[in-house]
């Protein structure tokens, strides 16, 4: 092989967005300039598919639904994907890693994502699902379909990251529009994918590669991920604190047997602060966890430090227990804030209403992670490090606003 073509040695990463929500998420990733991956859009809605800028577009509804969508019926979505199994297999060939992203609860994404994941794994690719759980206001039927879809997908992927959209409301303004809420969900899906691909595609002082990611995520089941950034004194520790204490995921990284840890900063990033950040993460993982560490020097970050934590390999996670009890991760984060000061942990440049549209590599890292519970500590940045157009400090939606009428809401396919 010609040694002048090093790109041939790079891991082949493909991101598949299936259904309206998944295709919207892929479009968002393309807009933000996510690099080093191939984008594939799959849908039963031909019109929505035409609007995608993905490298590969696959209409799986041209016979079964005549390109008109799955009508929020997961059985139709599953059948459509199975009818085009050979085409899906063809576009996934050669991939080392496949991300399957979708908005759970609709038809095409909910029913088709497990089919895509099964095909990807059968081809030998490390297969990671990154999906959203629907907002409560989308209705009980959609919620039930989402839960069934998540459980089915979990059996077909190596690792599954589930992002509950309702948690976005905890960092949203009461006046946020429904369209902006769904765009914010797309941003979180982007964060889930880029947080992993960056570890592989960005050269490091201490390198992480595809084999490192695979050793933690292959057959790992559920995974939790956090991305935090901070500036100023003790920036690496504060970034690590944000990475393990975000309000957006439903469980804690406590007891993880596998952890990927990447710390990025300028050339002045100090050994002591790297050590402190790594120690913070180590203390909340399993005592015998396989912790793989990488450090990237990027002068474009300036005074900013960025920490990415991916935790997987849990013995068992009781979400009810996590929701009601303070975890070691939370207690560690709280003690760190007490030692270093709270408000300083807000990443510089991330105000209450940050601007959308910046490049995901030059902008402060969009982050989400493992803090269960919400609104418990005013020192956590209100936007939790996310580059989304959501002003902070809103109450969670009241359960009294949920009614039978919402169960029958008919959402346009581009929001499914």
From Swiss-Prot:
Residues 404-416 have a biased composition (Basic and acidic residues). It comes from Kocuria rhizophila (strain ATCC 9341 / DSM 348 / NBRC 103217 / DC2201). Residues 319-416 are annotated as: Disordered. GTP binds at residues 20-24, 107-109, 138, 142, 186. It is found in: Cytoplasm. Belongs to the FtsZ family. This is Cell division protein FtsZ. The keyword Cell cycle applies. InterPro entries: Cell_div_FtsZ (IPR000158), Cell_div_FtsZ_CS (IPR020805), FtsZ/CetZ (IPR045061), FtsZ_C (IPR024757), Tub_FtsZ_C (IPR008280), Tubulin/FtsZ-like_C (IPR037103), Tubulin/FtsZ_2-layer-sand-dom (IPR018316), Tubulin/FtsZ_GTPase_sf (IPR036525). PROSITE patterns: FTSZ_1, FTSZ_2. GO terms for cellular component: cell division site; cytoplasm. HAMAP family: FtsZ (MF_00909). It comes from the Bacteria. Residues 376-392 have a biased composition (Acidic residues). Gene3D superfamilies: Tubulin/FtsZ, C-terminal domain, Tubulin/FtsZ, GTPase domain. One of its GO terms (biological process) is protein polymerization. Transmembrane segments: none annotated. Homodimer. Polymerizes to form a dynamic ring structure in a strictly GTP-dependent manner. Interacts directly with several other division proteins. Residues 319-335 have a biased composition (Polar residues). Essential cell division protein that forms a contractile ring structure (Z ring) at the future cell division site. The regulation of the ring assembly controls the timing and the location of cell division. One of the functions of the FtsZ ring is to recruit other cell division proteins to the septum to produce a new cell wall between the dividing cells. Binds GTP and shows GTPase activity. Keywords: Cell cycle, Cell division, Cytoplasm, GTP-binding, Nucleotide-binding, Septation. One of its GO terms (molecular function) is GTP binding. Pfam families: FtsZ_C (PF12327), Tubulin (PF00091).
